[in-house]
């Protein structure tokens, strides 16, 4: 709680005074996980029944600041709110770069848990409702249909995969989408955008999560959330 900044953010590591460690970090659900912990503390869920009220109050305040940060960092493209980058600049709140292959983008992976967290809020404000609605719309329009992973052994005897056509497979979402035109892209350690996963090297292709189906969770929970909150 002491480390949470005035701008209501949490960075990835502390103390790390420079580099991407200072960014607002949604990557690997870092901020969402911390917020869920804070909520368990102020709600005095097991094993936190012993926590004094003074600390619970601070945890609640920190959680609320986290929600404020999420609302402020939702990326707006061409006047329309979308989702989030895996990390945002701690000063400007703009999408930011982390490791060489983690470029400023819209995240089809980290954004899912952010939306699910927002949908868990009781009595959501209109601002929260709008944020959720816009993010879910992005998930609906950004799904990738008609492909699946096919694993194989390459010429060097290593396990690898490629994306192949599939007519009846569930939709996927890319890890990263361009900020210019919402196009899925991939990067190697040289930081160059590629638009076909076969164009990056074996090490990064297999050592990082480039596709996921977590958007299905968002869409399912969204329908439940609408009914619970009587949203048309």
What are these regions (language model features)?
Residues 1-9:
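Single conserved hydrophobic/aromatic residue that forms the stacking wall/gate
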Residues 36, 40-65, 92-98, 102, ...:
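Terminal, non-catalytic domain-edge segments
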Residues 3, 61, 83-87, 130-133:
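Short sequence/structural elements of tandem HEAT/ARM alpha-solenoid repeats
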Residues 10-26, 90-104:
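A cross-kingdom feature marking solvent-exposed beta-strand/loop segments within repeated
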Residues 3, 18-21, 25-37, 43-47:
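Solenoidal tandem-repeat scaffolds enriched in leucines and small polar residues
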Residues 16, 20-31, 52, 56-59, ...:
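Short capping loops/turns at secondary-structure boundaries
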Residues 69-86, 147-154:
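Positively charged
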């Amino acid at each position: 709680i002491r480390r949470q900044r005035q701008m209501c953010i949490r960075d990835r590591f502390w103390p790390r005074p420079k580099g991407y460690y200072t960014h607002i970090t949604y990557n690997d659900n870092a901020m969402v996980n911390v917020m869920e912990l804070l909520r368990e503390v102020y709600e005095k869920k097991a094993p936190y029944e012993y926590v004094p009220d003074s600390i619970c109050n601070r945890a609640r305040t920190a959680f609320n600041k986290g929600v404020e940060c999420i609302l402020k960092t939702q990326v707006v493209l061409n006047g329309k709110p979308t989702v989030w980058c895996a990390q945002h600049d701690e000063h400007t709140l703009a999408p930011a770069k982390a490791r060489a292959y983690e470029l400023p983008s819209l995240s089809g992976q980290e954004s899912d848990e952010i939306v699910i967290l927002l949908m868990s809020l009781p009595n959501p404000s209109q601002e929260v409702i709008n944020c959720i609605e816009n993010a879910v719309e992005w998930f609906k329009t950004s799904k990738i249909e008609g492909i699946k992973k096919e694993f194989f052994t390459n010429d060097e005897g290593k396990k690898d995969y490629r994306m192949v056509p599939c007519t009846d497979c569930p939709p996927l979402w890319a890890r990263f989408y361009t900020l210019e035109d919402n196009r899925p892209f991939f990067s190697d350690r040289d930081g160059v955008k590629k638009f076909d996963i076969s164009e990056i090297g074996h090490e990064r292709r297999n050592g990082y999560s480039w596709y996921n189906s977590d958007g299905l969770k968002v869409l399912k929970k969204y329908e439940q959330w609408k009914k619970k909150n009587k949203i048309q």
